[in-house]
Amino acid sequence: AEKIKICLQKQVNSSFSLHNVFGGNLYATEEKRMFELVKPKAGASVLNQSTWICFGDSRTDQSNSAFPRSADVSAKTAEKFRSLSGGSLMLSMFGPPGKVDYLYQGCGKHKVFYEGVNWSPHAAIDCYRKNWTDIKLNFQKSIYELASQSHCMSLVNALDKTIPLQATKGVAKNCNNSFLKNPALYTQEVKPLEQICGEENLAFFTLPTQFGTYECKLHLVASCYFIYDSKEVYNKRGCGNYFQVIYDSSGKVVGGLDNRVSPYTGNSGDTPTMQCDMLQLKPGRYSVRSSPRFLLMPERSYCFDMKEKGLVTAVQSIWGKGRKSDYAVDQACLSTPGCMLIQKQKPYIGEADDHHGDQEMRELLSGLDYEARCISQSGWVNETSPFTEEYLLPPKFGRCPLAAKEESIPKIPDGLLIPTSGTDTTVTKPKSRIFGIDDLIIGLFFVAIVEAGIGGYLLGSRKESGGGVTKESAEKGFEKIGNDIQILRSSTNIAIEKLNDRISHDEQAIRDLTLEIENARSEALLGELGIIRALLVGNISIGLQESLWELASEITNRAGDLAVEVSPGCWIIDNNICDQSCQNFIFKFNETAPVPTIPPLDTKIDLQSDPFYWGSSLGLAITTPISLAALVISGIAICRTK
């Protein structure tokens, strides 16, 4: 009889790298970073496709005769817009003669504004004011501010009002022989006698608590009045000083101008200029008092429900060549906390005409077709990696990656994986031992693995008191790290909110502080990943060793009396009794099926956090898929000895 010894033998050479961790070690043919750095895509996107709304004009209007060539967005995104060609929120607020008057209204947690160009210097709107840019800036800023605190908003295009009997609607030559719809101009006929100057105007208007289906907790109202350079300009007929003042129901002044107590400009000019201040007023009844001759009456508002904080994105709205634009939208967004601004880098060049269908703008707005994990002033990200090469500029919302250097991201073994025989001798009760951040806090420790030669693996029975990290303890370690990170981030967020309150007057200080905190969090997260990497390697090592034990047990069971296990992973077999086909059945499973191995280990960790700063939030989806199927047998050779 000829007896031979068949053993499982390691296949490790110089191409393998050794990964030492507490609890178990691995040889691997490759390694990869736990995460790759992501690069934000320029432009706008949204966190949730079901909770956003847009306000636009002809560049987003599906009813435009040149659509889709006239559009800067896809047909899918255009469905989200409340748009009408020629319209803008400010045009609907003031209603200058001959301009589009569209009822803007809608609801959404995230509001995108791509409008404003239709009221610009090219529109040449006069009505007692040659340049409306500063009023437009304040109007857009107020819209963005209130929209960020509301779920729904709507134009209220008809306020209830009471007008004095002696006043009648007036017109102006410099307003196309008409006047604005808001404010409306009312005049009194005054005889050219000093003693007959007319009566003081007393009017009333009511801001509703609801407009249609839209709840109104706060209204944006334009308080407009004339500015005279001198008393003589207004007082040509000897009728005193000019005043136009708005009072609330308690008699408190909330807006307007009173030249009875305030000085005139002192400039030289014969024509007054109209000024409009943006007031945020609660629903209720208000009174307007004005000097004889003229009354400017608020007749419209924008109403906001103020129900929840939300996100606001403003898109630069400018003309193509040959038309003069302003940059009020840009300036308004940049001066509104939390507003994200989308800006072009090149002149507007349209496809349908010079002013509609710009390719760069289409690219910047293409992200509105998708859901992003993070949106920021630097762009949007939909990858799951928690790291980016450059710091993302605020404002930012969602699960935003932190800035990190590529070389600082831990690497994990990949490719062909083979466990070693090394164990962490400092761990005596693996089933009750939990690895976590406390291991680093209590004190640093270093585990030296001393092996003969290049190393390998050990097959055999595992004792309860043996070293190594069990799958159960690794999973508990993951859970503990997750909880530690949650506590750390929650405390950090609370601290940030308090600091924001204390230094809210210094926006740059907030930005600097936030950057420092983000850098610290990035370093902390990289440290956490180092721990997670160690747990992963230990978990995989134990899993592979379990697979080898299962393989050895399966071989012993298949052999029955034909082979005798003389040591872990080695069997003696009688070559005359068990021929090649018999051996193939036992050791190669008839060469018809792969060697049974454990399924891929679940190494997915999902760490969530509370909102970050300025409404933002940070989260991680740490996913390290490691496929172990068929890897164990590919790293093992059948060694025969006689």
From Swiss-Prot:
Q: Which InterPro entries match?
A: Capsid_hemagglutn (IPR008980), Hemagglutn-estrase_core (IPR007142), Hemagglutn-estrase_hemagglutn (IPR003860), Hemagglutn_influenz_A/B (IPR001364), Hemagglutn_stalk_influenz-C (IPR014831)
Give GO MF terms, alphabetically. host cell surface receptor binding; sialate 4-O-acetylesterase activity; sialate 9-O-acetylesterase activity
Q: What are the protein's UniProt keywords?
A: Disulfide bond, Fusion of virus membrane with host endosomal membrane, Fusion of virus membrane with host membrane, Glycoprotein, Hemagglutinin, Host cell membrane, Host membrane, Host-virus interaction, Hydrolase, Membrane, Transmembrane, Transmembrane helix, Viral attachment to host cell, Viral envelope protein, Viral penetration into host cytoplasm, Virion, Virus endocytosis by host, Virus entry into host cell
Segments of this protein annotated with the region Esterase domain-1: 1-83
Q: Which residues cross the membrane?
A: 618-638
Glycosylation: residue positions: N13, N48, N131, N176, N382, N539, N590
Picking any one GO biological process from the record gives: endocytosis involved in viral entry into host cell
Region of interest called Fusion domain-1, as start-end residue ranges on this chain = 1
Listed under catalytic activity are: N-acetyl-9-O-acetylneuraminate + H2O = N-acetylneuraminate + acetate + H(+); N-acetyl-4-O-acetylneuraminate + H2O = N-acetylneuraminate + acetate + H(+)
Assigned GO CC terms: host cell plasma membrane; membrane; viral envelope; virion membrane
List every stretch annotated Esterase domain-2. 297-351
Question: Any idea which residues are catalytic in this one?
Answer: D353, H356
Q: How does it sit in the membrane?
A: Single-pass type I membrane protein
Disulfide cysteine pairs (residue numbers): C197-C239, C216-C303, C224-C276
Describe how it is modified after translation: In natural infection, inactive HEF is matured into HEF1 and HEF2 outside the cell by one or more trypsin-like, arginine-specific endoprotease.
Give the span(s) annotated as Fusion domain-2. 352-637
Ranges in the topological domain labelled Cytoplasmic: 639-642
Q: What is its EC number?
A: 3.1.1.53
Q: Does the keyword Transmembrane apply?
A: yes
Q: Report if keyword Kinase is assigned.
A: no
Q: What is its main location?
A: virion
Entry function: Binds to the N-acetyl-9-O-acetylneuraminic acid residues on the cell surface, bringing about the attachment of the virus particle to the cell. Plays a major role in the determination of host range restriction and virulence. Class I viral fusion protein. Responsible for penetration of the virus into the cell cytoplasm by mediating the fusion of the membrane of the endocytosed virus particle with the endosomal membrane. Low pH in endosomes induce an irreversible conformational change in HEF2, releasing the fusion hydrophobic peptide. Several trimers are required to form a competent fusion pore.
The subunit field of the Swiss-Prot or TrEMBL record says: Homotrimer of disulfide-linked HEF1-HEF2.
The record's family statement is: Belongs to the influenza viruses hemagglutinin family.
Protein name, per record? Hemagglutinin-esterase-fusion glycoprotein
Species source reads Influenza C virus (strain C/Pig/Beijing/10/1981)
Source taxonomy lineage? Viruses, Riboviria, Orthornavirae, Negarnaviricota, Polyploviricotina
Name the gene that codes for it: HE
